[in-house]
């Protein structure tokens, strides 16, 4: 983009828009143990110093654990796990610490053996077992042991990932969790719905989990679904309007951790979302951004939920939708000089910014990812359609003379003037420092994409293509990466 084009009226109007208070990193804590038994124990310590009653399920009996979770909440009891044939050491120790007098075992002897039950009894603890002939029957019997209610949550009894996010809702409202399969309703479920006078149901999962045929047979059903387990969990939080002042985060494939963690979320009257263990899932990012979540408790130690995910949650850019617009494209090459086409430099740097922001937990969106042309208005429209929180326009500079050099960042005063200025002020010094270029400062100009974009917006001029020294840097991957790092770091600093 040529400098003489940029000789536009510079706007030095008073900036009256609100500048957000500087933010700190998000709060991230973690609770976990060396295994599923230890993690459940550590979770219980977040809720109880003593507990007269505890609920115990088999460590691999996920359906039993799901149906038991609302019962545990209602009994003011922790949910603990055990090995099938021997009382787990961690659980045994915890029962003693809590001075527990009564244990409710949920599940039959294949899940928690008679020998294990006897080991619990030997601690001077009274035992009650709730068990049915199958998971449907066990869930129905748990429902009967709970208080009166007219609503139930319905899940596919084999799709465990559908359950954790809805457990806090079911538990705190006293709703039992009942099971069905995709194409039919088990007789035990039908009977308990009738016996308890259930008149409305929340059906969790799409038609791949519970068919419309089953759905239509349930009393006054409402369905919550998602394209995957992460989106489903996010949709549960969104549609049920669960509290998010503290959000519990668990690996979507670590069912024991997720279910036990959900009981903690229920006790604290908060919500739980799911993530991939190695990288914060898109579904989690979206709900974090839309709900402005900033306090997190991770369920499970590494590797269940990696340090990378913890760092993403901590980063204030997490969940923010950042629109990245590499200028020019296709027939519009932009500036040309020293063997460089501006459109190619812009795209290279933009892709690097995209990668870095994605790694930090943001939701970056590129206006183009290849040599494609979009009009300026199309770029503005794309950012609006993406509901972007920020707009980053990336360019390289040029002049008729080869002398001008350096880096500069522009903002416009039409919309979000103060916030745009602040964003530019965070990016510009980092850009000049990283590239070792002349710092030409932060300036105002009515460039189309930043003038007509309604979110905070900046146009970054990385360096001059027409200057030999600047161009030599724009030819090198290491410097293009440094430019991208500066734009990333400035964006993160804006949120701090």
UniProtKB/Swiss-Prot annotation:
Keyword Repeat: yes
Keywords tagged on the record: Cell wall, Cell wall biogenesis/degradation, Hydrolase, Repeat, Secreted, Signal
Residues of the signal peptide: 1-24
Catalytic activity: Hydrolyzes the link between N-acetylmuramoyl residues and L-amino acid residues in certain cell-wall glycopeptides
Classification via SMART domains: Ami_3 (SM00646)
Repeat (Sequence) residue spans along the chain: 30-128, 129-222, 223-318
Induction: Expressed under the control of SigD (major), the transcripts being predominants at the exponential growth phase, and SigA (minor). Repressed by LytR and YvrH.
Deletion phenotype: Inactivation of this gene leads to an approximately 90% decrease in the total cell wall hydrolytic activity of stationary-phase cells and extraordinary resistance to cell lysis, even after 6 days of incubation at 37 degrees Celsius. Cells from domesticated laboratory strains lacking this gene show no motility changes on swarm plates; however in combination with an acetylglucosaminidase deletion (lytD, AC P39848) greatly reduced motility is seen. They also show no apparent changes in cell morphology, competence, sporulation, or germination.
Keyword match Plastid: no
Subcellular location: Secreted, Cell wall
An MF annotation (GO) of this entry: N-acetylmuramoyl-L-alanine amidase activity
Gene Ontology biological process terms in this record: cell wall organization; peptidoglycan catabolic process
Sequence similarity: Belongs to the N-acetylmuramoyl-L-alanine amidase 3 family.
Protein name per Swiss-Prot or TrEMBL: N-acetylmuramoyl-L-alanine amidase LytC
Organism of provenance: Bacillus subtilis (strain 168)
Encoding gene per record: lytC
């Amino acid at each position: 983009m040529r400098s003489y084009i940029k000789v536009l009226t510079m706007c030095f109007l008073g900036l009256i828009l609100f500048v957000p208070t500087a933010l700190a990193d998000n709060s991230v804590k973690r609770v976990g143990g060396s295994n599923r038994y230890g993690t459940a124990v550590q979770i219980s310590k977040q809720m109880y110093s003593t507990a007269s009653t505890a609920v115990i399920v088999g460590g691999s009996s996920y359906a039993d654990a799901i149906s038991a979770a609302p019962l545990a909440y209602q009994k003011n009891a922790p949910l603990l796990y055990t090995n099938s044939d021997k009382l787990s050491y961690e659980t045994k120790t915890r029962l003693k610490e809590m001075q527990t007098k009564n244990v409710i075992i949920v599940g039959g002897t294949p899940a928690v053996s008679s020998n294990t039950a006897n080991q619990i009894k030997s601690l001077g603890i009274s035992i009650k077992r709730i068990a049915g002939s199958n998971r449907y029957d066990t869930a129905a019997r748990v429902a009967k042991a709970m208080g009166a209610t007219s609503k139930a949550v319905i899940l596919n009894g084999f799709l465990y990932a559908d359950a954790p996010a809805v457990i806090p809702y079911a538990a705190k409202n006293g709703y039992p969790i009942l099971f069905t399969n995709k194409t039919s309703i088990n007789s035990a479920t039908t009977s308990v719905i009738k016996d308890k006078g259930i008149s409305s149901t929340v059906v969790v999962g799409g038609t791949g989990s519970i068919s419309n045929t089953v759905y239509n047979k349930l009393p006054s059903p409402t369905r919550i679904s998602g394209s995957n387990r992460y989106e489903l969990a996010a949709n549960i939080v969104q549609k049920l309007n669960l509290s998010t002042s503290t959000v519990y985060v668990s690996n979507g494939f670590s069912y024991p951790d997720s279910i036990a963690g959900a009981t903690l979320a229920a006790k604290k009257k908060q919500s739980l979302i799911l993530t991939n263990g190695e990288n914060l899932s898109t579904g989690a990012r979206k709900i974090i951004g839309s709900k402005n979540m900033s306090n997190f408790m991770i369920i499970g130690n590494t590797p269940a939920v990696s340090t990378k995910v913890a760092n993403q949650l901590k980063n204030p850019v997490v969940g923010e939708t950042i629109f990245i617009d590499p200028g020019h494209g296709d027939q519009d090459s932009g500036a040309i000089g020293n063997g460089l086409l501006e459109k190619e430099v812009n795209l290279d740097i933009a892709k690097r910014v995209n990668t870095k922001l994605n790694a930090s937990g943001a939701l970056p969106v590129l206006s183009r990812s290849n040599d494609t042309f979009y009009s300026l208005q199309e770029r503005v429209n794309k950012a609006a359609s993406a509901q972007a929180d920020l707009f980053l326009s990336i360019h390289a500079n040029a002049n008729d003379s080869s002398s001008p050099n350096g880096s500069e960042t522009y903002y416009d005063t039409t919309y979000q003037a103060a916030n745009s200025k602040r964003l530019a002020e965070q990016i510009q010094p980092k850009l000049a420092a990283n590239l070792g270029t002349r710092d030409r400062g932060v300036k105002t100009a009515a460039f189309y994409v930043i003038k007509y974009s309604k979110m905070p917006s900046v146009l970054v001029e990385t360096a001059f293509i027409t200057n030999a020294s600047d161009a030599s840097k724009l030819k090198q991957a290491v410097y293009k990466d440094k430019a991208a790092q500066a734009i990333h770091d400035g964006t993160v600093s804006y949120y701090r």
